[in-house]
Amino acid sequence: LDAQPHPLSVYQGLTMIIGFTGTPGSGKTYEAVKKILDNLMKGKVIYTNIDGMFDPECQEMIKSYCNLSDLALTIQLRQLEPDQIADFWMHIEPRCLVVLDEIHKWFSNRDWNDPKNKQFGYWASTHRHYGYEVVLITQNIERVDAAVRSLLEWNYVYRKVNFLGSAVQRYYLCYSYGGDDTNGRPLVTNKRRYKPAIFRCYKS
């Protein structure tokens, strides 16, 4: 179903900041968890605050899905606490993947003059060669501070497949945009299929 190359294939070790946007049930969190699982299987260290991924039942499913030992999962998958997200860059290591859910709660457009928003931009600009990859998840990218939005290389907008029939829940749509502007025609459009096993790795 993913006939066209994913834009993230251009990632060459520079810091990459991308957005996953969509209403509840659109597939955005599912896609983020899938990305986490794919990177766990590659041996990457990941920091996230996605709900449920650190519950014992979900941890067992993650170990089974990725074929990881208890020790490997503990080393690779690390939880970011709520009080760490506003300065998450102080709690991570180079070349890791960071996946932040509900990012508008910490970097809101209503707090446009908050120093932490400027600090995020400063960190991103001064650590470009450290190989971080950061995924910012939100229901509406407009709710995120403009300075933070401007850091996005790509924004992926997820939508439900709104057709009647039993196959509806098997698929979702992904629209790929360059930067934070989602007006106009997307650069890439994909219809993607859900894998039921991934839902058991977090609280959907």
Regions found by a protein language model. Give the residues of each.
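Short, Lys/Arg-enriched N-terminal segments with co-localized hydrophobic residues
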Residues: 1-15
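Loop/turn-to-beta-strand initiation segments
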Residues: 44, 94-97, 130-136
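Hydrophobic/aromatic beta-strand patches that form the interior of the parallel beta-sheet core
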Residues: 18, 47, 99, 135, ...
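Glycine-rich P-loop/Walker A and Walker A-like loops and their local beta1-loop-alpha1 context
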Residues: 16-37
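Conserved nucleotide-sensing/catalytic segment adjacent to the nucleotide-binding pocket
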Residues: 55-122
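Conserved P-loop NTPase motor module
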Residues: 169-204
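Short beta-strand-centered segment that lines the nucleotide-binding/catalytic pocket of NTP-utilizing
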Residues: 44-52
